[in-house]
């Protein structure tokens, strides 16, 4: 597959050897399955703010603190620099949350780094190496559903104890 423009710098730097296929496209990012040496990972390319379909971005960012007063003022004013800082803050918050949730014992993809709006992370697969299906595509027994629900509730408790929760 042809390497998308936003992934080309990672390929040039040797972080990605090959783009295998697109995995999904969502309101905030496009995700591709990539090969890094002998390991298969995924690359999440965040969409630029102008191309995202976040209808309530202001609410999403509400309560996120920025310690650097210059950055905070620029973000409040909405200058070009401020918008870039807001993007960087939002992307770094996701990476930080992944590390924090992992330390709390929640099963999340391991991040390998965020490079110019591209998050390189672990691809979660089943025993055969197949990508996990979307929940809407899964059928399971009532017993399996109860077991999975109990596990998810344990993860929610761990997330709350870590001071984080996610709507997805």
Pin down the residues of each PLM region.
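Conserved ATP-binding subdomain of kinase catalytic cores across diverse folds
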Residues: 1-131, 161
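Catalytic-loop of the protein kinase fold
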Residues: 161-168
């Amino acid at each position: 597959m042809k390497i998308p423009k936003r992934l080309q710098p990672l390929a040039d730097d040797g972080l990605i050897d090959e783009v295998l296929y697109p995995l999904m496209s969502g309101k905030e990012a496009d995700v591709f399955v990539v090969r890094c040496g002998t390991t298969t990972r995924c690359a999440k390319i965040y969409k630029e703010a102008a191309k995202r379909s976040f209808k309530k971005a202001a609410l999403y960012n509400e309560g996120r603190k920025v310690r650097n007063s210059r950055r905070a003022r620029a973000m409040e004013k909405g200058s070009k620099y401020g918008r870039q800082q807001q993007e960087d803050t939002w992307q770094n918050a996701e990476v930080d949350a992944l590390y924090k949730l992992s330390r709390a014992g929640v099963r999340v993809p391991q991040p390998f780094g965020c490079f110019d709006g591209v998050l390189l992370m672990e691809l979660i697969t089943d025993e055969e190496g197949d990508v996990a299906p979307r929940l809407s595509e899964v059928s399971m027994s009532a017993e399996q559903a109860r077991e999975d629900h109990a596990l998810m509730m344990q993860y929610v408790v761990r997330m709350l104890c870590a001071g984080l929760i996610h709507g997805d």
